[in-house]
Amino acid sequence: TYGGFVIKDKDGNEYNSNKATISGLAAHTTYYYKVDDKEIKSFKTGNTGKFRFAFVGDPQIGSSNELKGSDTEAFYNAQSNAVANDSYNWSQTLKKIQSAGTDFIVSAGDQIQTTKKKAPGNSSTTSEIEYAGYLSPDTLASLPVATTVGNHDADNANYQYHFNVPNLSNLGDNGKVGGDYYFTYGDVLFMMLNTQDTNSAEH
């Protein structure tokens, strides 16, 4: 299945969010795919009988920017430089993770740095460059990541435009980024809780 929609920033620039879901894949098999006119990529499905995953926390692309959010050229330049530096380090980390034979990654949250509250004008798209940096490493074309909502992700619907999660529930939904979700890998159940919704009874 496939679905897409558009959001706009304060200048009227449009951003597309496209999500695709495929089913019926065989285990331990290489598949090839292509997005628009980009180069062909591949991924290999895992062996669910025995697998390895990496647990990471706070990639927080853009966090090396020491300037507070302001609608100034200085802030945007500092943000751009921070994203470049943080994305490089994130990419190097992912290469090491993949070289260890990892099947997928579980992220504890805070994929990016700039919250909507601290963005210039409370813009929901200021973090777009940070998400672009987070998703830029070539490794992520073939290495799946299961993300969790962190406090830097939670106040901005922009988070949910970048990740396609399975079995999404309205339980734990804080009204912006969706609720809890789960998936199984082999005989293991992974339950991903949106802990930014503090109603513990819902989870």
Q: Positions of the model-derived regions?
A:
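Acidic, histidine-bearing metal-coordination/catalytic regions of metal-dependent phosphoesterases
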Residues: 1-77, 98-99
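Phosphate-binding active sites in nucleotide-utilizing proteins
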Residues: 102-107, 111-114
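Acidic/histidine-rich helix-loop elements
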Residues: 2-6, 12, 55-91, 115-125, ...
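Active-site glycine-centered loops adjacent to acidic/histidine catalytic or metal-binding residues
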Residues: 58, 109-110, 150-151
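Extended active-site neighborhood of metal-dependent phosphoesterases/phosphodiesterases
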Residues: 12-21, 30-42, 74-78, 119-203
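Well-ordered alpha-helical segments embedded in enzymatic catalytic cores
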Residues: 89-96, 133
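Short active-site segment of divalent metal-dependent hydrolases/proteases
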Residues: 61, 112-113, 153, 189
